[in-house]
């Protein structure tokens, strides 16, 4: 009897195996027809849902798992072309495809552009912006699973072998133009390097991205810097908002993305050198941060999103440990905590961004201090606000005032409120 049951199981497995094999063969034989059907479906969907014309001049499979396309074009009706690419060649991981995942093994693309245009008649990408969902299902998202799924899908679309050539991102906001032209981008053996030409109405520069990228192990360490002399300038914002900003280099490191016990951990660091920003509403001169680094440990759970307290922010010689979280398990609770370990008061003063706190510039102090902040806000119970601020001083003395002589607060001085006439104020 047992032998008969075993034979039935073996026979069933063989039948399923043969059916699967026949299914694979059928898919392989008719794959070009299926591809054309898929393109037709996408074309109709673009016209129906996005009021846009989508076309591919030529598309065919190459080899066992390769796909080649030519003449990809996406044009919203009565608007400027949104996307155009001359050629794309890619290979897909066959076994991941059977598991329901699209994972790119290689990607070669050249000669194309993505164009974002705003005119008095509207924007050519409005139809593709996510629409606000007004239907409340009452279901809370599981933040850990949601973010992990998005990261996995995104990283699966990053190939391990990539060659991009002559691709551009063009932006035109009512005449305010910026073009980021990707001359080349190569990812081979986990090493990535690119050359980018930037052109705006106000400047032209050449940028470079170089470093390590391993999408399958979810790790990267890349550096972004200027090929030419001088700082990298941030495009578009100078014309659009009057914000002039620049920096020497940016580094991004992702060392760990891991789901453990229902919680998602994302760890790494990012840093920037010689960051400068100028805008009249920020300060009357350049604000400069010479060195800044953020060692981050993001944590996502079923009901919360947090920057863990093991994270560290370095600002010149100063460092502090932030904790920021949002929790909606019962109520919507926002938490902000910050801890500055014991440090020299003078190091704190010299670490402040240059130009932002001008009254501290030139100030000298002796002694040490540490600081702790605890802020908890329950949106559903605002009266239960928690705010604790604790400064512990150790022989803390201001030995020299900076640009502003704060000792004048002990005497008579002229005070001019915006809504009143000038008057003398005396502090007793």
Protein language model features and the residues they cover:
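N-terminal type II signal-anchor transmembrane helix
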Residues: 2-51, 283
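Flexible beta-edge/linker motif
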Residues: 58-130, 141-170, 190, 195-223, ...
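Interface amphipathic segments
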Residues: 81, 99-102, 178-253, 261, ...
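Tryptophan-anchored aromatic micro-motifs
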Residues: 158-169, 229, 272-274, 391-393
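Transmembrane beta-strands of outer-membrane beta-barrel proteins
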Residues: 222-223, 266-268, 334-336, 385-387
């Amino acid at each position: 009897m047992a032998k008969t049951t075993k034979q039935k199981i073996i026979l069933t497995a063989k039948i399923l195996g043969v059916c699967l094999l026949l299914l694979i063969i059928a898919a392989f034989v008719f794959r070009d027809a299926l591809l054309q059907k898929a393109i037709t479906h996408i074309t109709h969907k673009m016209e129906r849902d996005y009021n846009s014309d989508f076309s591919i001049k030529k598309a065919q499979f190459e080899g066992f798992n390769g796909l080649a396309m030519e003449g990809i074009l996406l044009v919203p009706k009565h608007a400027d072309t949104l996307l155009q690419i001359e050629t794309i060649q890619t290979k897909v991981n066959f076994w991941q495809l059977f598991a329901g995942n699209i994972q790119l093994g290689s990607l070669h693309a050249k000669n194309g552009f993505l164009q974002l245009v705003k005119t008095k008649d509207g924007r050519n990408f409005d139809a593709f912006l996510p629409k606000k969902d007004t239907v409340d299902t009452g279901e809370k998202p599981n933040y850990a699973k949601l973010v992990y799924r998005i990261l996995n899908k995104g990283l699966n679309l990053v190939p391990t072998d990539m060659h991009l050539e002559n691709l551009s991102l063009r932006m035109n906001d009512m005449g305010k133009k910026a073009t980021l032209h990707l001359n080349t981008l190569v990812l081979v053996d986990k090493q990535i390097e690119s050359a980018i030409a930037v052109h705006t109405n106000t400047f032209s520069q050449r940028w470079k991205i170089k470093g390590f990228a391993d999408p399958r192990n979810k790790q990267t360490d890349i550096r972004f810097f200027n090929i030419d002399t001088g700082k990298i300038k941030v495009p578009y914002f100078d014309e659009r908002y009057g914000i002039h900003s620049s920096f020497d280099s940016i580094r991004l490191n992702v060392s760990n993305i891991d789901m453990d016990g229902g919680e998602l951990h994302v760890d790494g660091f990012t840093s920037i050198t010689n960051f400068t920003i100028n805008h009249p509403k920020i300060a009357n001169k350049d604000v400069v941060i010479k060195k800044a680094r953020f060692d981050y440990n993001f944590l996502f759970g079923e009901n919360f999103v947090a920057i863990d307290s093991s994270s560290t922010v370095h600002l010149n010689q100063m460092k502090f440990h932030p904790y920021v979280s949002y929790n909606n398990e019962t109520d919507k609770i926002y938490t902000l905590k910050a801890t500055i370990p014991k440090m020299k008061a003078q190091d704190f003063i010299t670490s402040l961004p240059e130009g932002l706190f001008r009254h501290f510039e030139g100030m000298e102090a002796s002694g040490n201090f540490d600081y702790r902040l605890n802020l908890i806000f329950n949106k559903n119970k605002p009266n239960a606000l928690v705010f604790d601020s604790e400064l512990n001083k150790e022989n803390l003395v201001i030995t020299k005032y900076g640009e502003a002589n704060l000792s004048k607060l002990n005497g008579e001085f002229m005070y001019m409120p915006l809504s009143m006439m000038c008057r003398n104020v005396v502090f007793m």
